[in-house]
């Protein structure tokens, strides 16, 4: 029997703040395969997420099919907008949701991994992060500040993650990020520079597959996930319509489930995918192949 076995592997999933998104599903399926999992949570959501766990509000979501419950090794406050604390503006440092944490930057969390778990503590790093403050604006109406903020948070953050966490990976490590079809097709309403950010993320995946592969011996891949009405995606404003559109028009006539993205991620991050790097893998019920809606 061919099984995905991640026993003895340690993973970090950046971008988990509830139990409803792809990041949580990936973390859970990595744990199902035997990995030890830590997550990074946006500081303003950190207290809420940790309380949800402590109070048992998401206990059903933590139940593993193999038995037992998902227990995160660590939940790190994590803001991928900042590489180091020197990059954090004073108004953020003094914000009550940030000031209780000593370091929540990309390099800071990488350093904490080494401090707590020693040299080369990781095997898997997942980037499940995106933010576009002007996502509801058409590209023509997007400000320079909003556009650059989308690219910084949604794509450059992966470059920074690879730079800071690459040295922490043990042999045959793997990186993974999440993209969306808007990187290559027009999705009206998905604005604010987010389509550009996803296109950059996919391009960076290819470039980093070479650079990270040669420097750290690690693989770098991307999953292009179908539309899903997560709490984070609700910021787009029309996500429910996109989910229904995908259900009606995908080759399988279904909408995606987070578990399916989690399963694909577990495979891509496992030794079974040792020959796959620099790839964008579609997990969208085949929506990416459709040129027109079913009913034109």
Write out the residue ranges for each language-model feature.
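Canonical Rossmann dinucleotide-binding motif of NAD(H)/NADP(H)-dependent dehydrogenases/reductases
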Residues: 3-47
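Catalytic loop of short-chain dehydrogenase/reductase
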Residues: 15-24, 42, 130-215, 224-230, ...
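Conserved mid-core segment of classical short-chain dehydrogenase/reductases
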Residues: 51-150, 167, 183, 189-190, ...
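A glycine/serine/threonine-rich, flexible loop-to-helix segment
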Residues: 54-55, 192, 215, 222-251, ...
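A conserved structural motif in NAD(P)-dependent oxidoreductases
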Residues: 101-104, 250-261, 272
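Short, small/polar-rich loop/turn modules that mediate ligand/substrate recognition or access, typified
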Residues: 217-219, 276-278
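Conserved SDR Rossmann-fold cofactor-binding beta-strand/turn motif
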Residues: 219-229, 269, 282-284
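Short C-terminal tail/terminal secondary-structure segment
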Residues: 266, 277-296
């Amino acid at each position: 029997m061919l099984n995905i076995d991640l026993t003895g592997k340690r993973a970090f999933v950046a971008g988990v703040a509830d139990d409803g998104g792809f990041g949580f599903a990936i973390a859970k399926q990595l744990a199902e395969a035997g990995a030890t999992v830590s997550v990074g949570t946006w500081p303003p959501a950190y207290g809420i997420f940790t309380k949800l766990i402590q109070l048992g509000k998401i206990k059903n979501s933590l139940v593993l099919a193999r038995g037992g419950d998902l227990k995160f090794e660590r939940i790190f406050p994590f803001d991928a907008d900042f590489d180091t604390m020197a990059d954090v503006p004073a108004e953020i440092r003094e914000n009550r949701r940030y000031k209780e944490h000593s370091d929540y930057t990309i390099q800071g969390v990488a350093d904490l991994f080494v401090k707590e778990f020693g040299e080369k503590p990781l095997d898997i790093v997942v980037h499940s992060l995106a933010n576009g403050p002007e996502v509801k604006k058409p590209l023509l109406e997007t400000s320079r500040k909003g556009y650059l903020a989308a690219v910084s948070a949604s794509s450059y953050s992966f470059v920074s993650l690879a730079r800071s966490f690459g040295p922490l990976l043990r042999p045959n490590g793997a990186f993974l990020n999440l993209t969306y079809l808007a990187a290559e097709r027009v999705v009206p309403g998905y604005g604010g520079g987010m389509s550009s950010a996803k296109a950059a993320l996919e391009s960076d995946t290819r470039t980093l597959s070479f650079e990270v592969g040669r420097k750290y011996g690690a693989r770098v891949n991307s999953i292009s996930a179908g539309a899903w009405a997560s709490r984070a995606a609700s910021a787009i404003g029309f996500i429910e319509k996109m989910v229904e559109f995908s259900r009606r028009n995908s080759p399988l006539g279904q909408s995606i489930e987070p578990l399916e993205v989690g399963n694909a991620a577990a495979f891509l991050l496992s030794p079974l995918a040792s020959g796959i790097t620099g790839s964008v893998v579609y997990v969208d019920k085949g929506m990416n192949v459709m040129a027109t809606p079913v009913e034109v």
